[in-house]
Structures are given as C-alpha cells and as structure tokens.
C-alpha cells in the first residue's frame, strides 16, 4: 500500500479535528526534519525503527551493453531498520 503525505494529513485532520492545511504543514515539517537528521546521523524513533545513511564503496561492475568493465561510483544509501516492537506488531497476526 502506498500512502501520500496528503493522505496522512487528512487522516490526522479527521482524528484531531485540526484543519487539513495545518495538518499538511505538520506532516511536511516532521518529514523534512526526519530527513535532515537522517542525512547527518543515525535517527532512531522509539518503538518504530532507525534510519541511517550507509556509504557504499566504489566497486567493479560490467556495462551490460558493451560487456566492458566499469567502476560503479560510491554512493549513499538510506537504510531503515524496524524496531523489535514494530516487527512483533507486524507478525502478531501469524500466531
């Protein structure tokens, strides 16, 4: 299931009774701040999980069109690690 920030804001608005515009601003601010923190360091949200940026080193590869060797450049990847509690909630129905 894909959910947009606008949908989250609408759900928040109906749950809390705030205006949709205010809720959109809150959601955008929260996501912006999470991304800003996660860019610099590991970010842990208690009972949800952790976001961390991992640097991938350059590595050899092959150009599939020409079959010639290439170097795949280094890059940063954002990684999410779910908390133990979140994993337990997800797998709760299997018991």
From Swiss-Prot:
Source organism superkingdom: Bacteria
SUPFAM superfamilies per the UniProt record, alphabetical: IHF-like DNA-binding proteins (SSF47729)
Cited PANTHER family: DNA-BINDING PROTEIN HU, INTEGRATION HOST FACTOR SUBUNIT ALPHA
Record family assignment: Belongs to the bacterial histone-like protein family.
Keywords: DNA-binding
Organism: Rickettsia felis (strain ATCC VR-1525 / URRWXCal2)
Molecular-function annotations in GO: DNA binding; structural constituent of chromatin
Gene Ontology annotations for the cellular component aspect, listed alphabetically: cytosol
Protein known as: Histone-like DNA-binding protein
Pfam family, one: Bac_DNA_binding
């Amino acid at each position: 299931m894909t959910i947009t920030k606008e949908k989250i804001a609408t759900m928040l608005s109906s749950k809390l009774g705030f205006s949709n515009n205010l809720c959109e601003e809150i959601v955008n601010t929260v996501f912006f701040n999470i991304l800003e923190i996660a860019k610099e360091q590991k970010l842990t949200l208690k009972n949800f999980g952790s976001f961390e940026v991992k640097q991938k080193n350059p590595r050899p590869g092959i150009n599939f069109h020409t079959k010639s060797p290439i170097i795949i450049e280094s890059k940063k990847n954002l990684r999410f690690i779910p908390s133990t509690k979140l994993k337990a909630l997800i797998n709760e129905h299997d018991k």
